[in-house]
Structure formats: structure tokens, C-alpha cells
Amino acid sequence: MDRRDFVRLSAIAGAMAVRGRPLAGQMVFPAASTVRRFDIPPFELEETTIADLQSAMASGRLTARSITQLYLDRIAELDRKGPTLRHVIEVNPDALAIADSLDQERKAGRVRGPLHGIPILLKDNIDTADRMTTTAGSLALAGSIPAHDAFIAARLRAAGAILLGKANLSEWAN
């Protein structure tokens, strides 16, 4: 039994106890054939910290491009194939080119700081003045490309972060 099943069954048992219904024989479990499981391979960077990534880039084991590609592949695996989570609305079409540029800066001895070459997702209500749209999760703003970066987006770019894409959220980010 995994954590989600435990929490679900605990909630059902609590609700039945409040209603005064007997628990024995009342539990109904979905048939095994109705539960869809996805075999999602583990992600090698899942528990990796920014400090770990910086160390790997400094030693030459990883590059900003290789890290960015790993994250793009993972987004495609979870959003477009497999469980189709749709947790990322769009990815930055320039992410790999930006990563290449930051790798060149690193080779030239210029590292902007601890975020240099680190891919980051932004919520879709943060303006980015690039080829990504900002919709705040609303169809009314579909195709909206801001004229200027939001303050946080500009600061992240200046620090060398790679704005990888926009994360999904509810309409108008409420």
C-alpha cells in the first residue's frame, strides 16, 4: 500500500465512522484492471540540488545544455507521453541555445553566480519578453507575449538561470 492509498482509505474510514456505518464489508476497492499505472523510470536529477549541479558543471561532468536536455526530456515524458500531466504549458524554444551560450560563458571563466546554467520553470503569470506567452492560465490571454520581463524574470536571466518554460496553473492564477 502506498501513501496515497493509505490516505484515501483513512479518509473513507473516517467518513464512515462519522456516519455510523460499519466498516466491515463496506469497503469497495477498484478492480485492478480499472487502475492505470504508468511505468515511469526514475529521474536521475530528482534529488539533485543546485549546488550539486554547479559542482557537476564546474568539473565538466555536466553542461548547462545536458542538464536542460534532461529536464526537457522529463517534461516530454510526463506531459506528452505517459500520464500526460500537462504541468508545463510550454517550453522555451530557445532554452538549448541559451544553455549553449551559458556554457560558453563558463568556458571563458565567467560564471554569473549560483544559478548560472540552471533550468527554472516559471508560473504562467510571470511575464517573459521572449517567444513564450504569458496567459495566467486563461484562454482570454492566449498568444499574449509581454513587451518586458517581469522583475523576477529579468533578475533570473541576469543571474544566468535558463527560463525553461511556463508551469500550468488555474485560470487567472487564483
Identify the meaning behind each predicted range.
Residues M1-G14:
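N-terminal secretory signal peptides and thylakoid transit peptides that target proteins
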Residues M16, M27-N174:
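Gly/Ser-rich catalytic/binding loops embedded in alpha/beta enzyme cores
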